[in-house]
């Protein structure tokens, strides 16, 4: 049997999608028990840049790409799957994921968001929430990751937001 710690990390993008009011998009997963919420994320296909992957994943998971990349978190952030998921999740080929995170500004209408375009859908509900309120949700095994990440992503959004809000409303 393969030692799980020798498995590689899957390259992945994470999307911190903010609306013009500074609220963060989160969605409830359909494949995990216990009302687990997260930001959109997904794998990077071979030959694809992280930026292209982020927009593609957004379109696949929430039905719209109507957003602008405002900032990119420096570096990659890796996490291990819980031991009971290694060998099962992610096709059983990865020990976890290494993520490049993007801060995006949502330029569409709420009615553009569609969770029913995948079969089966990855999410069944979504909300715009204050970034710090995300940490009060059930984030499953990603709780520690989000505790580290959310303050940094919110700060990146705040740094880019003034110019984006002004130009996106013009």
Swiss-Prot record:
SUPFAM superfamilies: Nudix. Its cofactor is a divalent metal cation. It comes from the Bacteria. PROSITE patterns: NUDIX (PS51462), NUDIX_BOX (PS00893). Disulfide bonds: none annotated. Pfam families: NUDIX. Gene3D superfamilies: Nucleoside Triphosphate Pyrophosphohydrolase. Residues 8-151 form the Nudix hydrolase domain. It is an enzyme of class 3 (hydrolase). GO terms for molecular function: bis(5'-adenosyl)-pentaphosphatase activity; guanosine-3',5'-bis(diphosphate) 3'-diphosphatase activity. A motif (Nudix box) lies at residues 42-63. Its EC number is 3.6.1.-. Keywords: Hydrolase. One of its GO terms (biological process) is nucleoside phosphate metabolic process. HAMAP family: Nudix_RppH (MF_00298). Belongs to the Nudix hydrolase family. RppH subfamily. Accelerates the degradation of transcripts by removing pyrophosphate from the 5'-end of triphosphorylated RNA, leading to a more labile monophosphorylated state that can stimulate subsequent ribonuclease cleavage. This is RNA pyrophosphohydrolase. It comes from Gluconobacter oxydans (strain 621H). The lineage of its organism: Bacteria, Pseudomonadati, Pseudomonadota, Alphaproteobacteria, Acetobacterales. The gene is rppH.
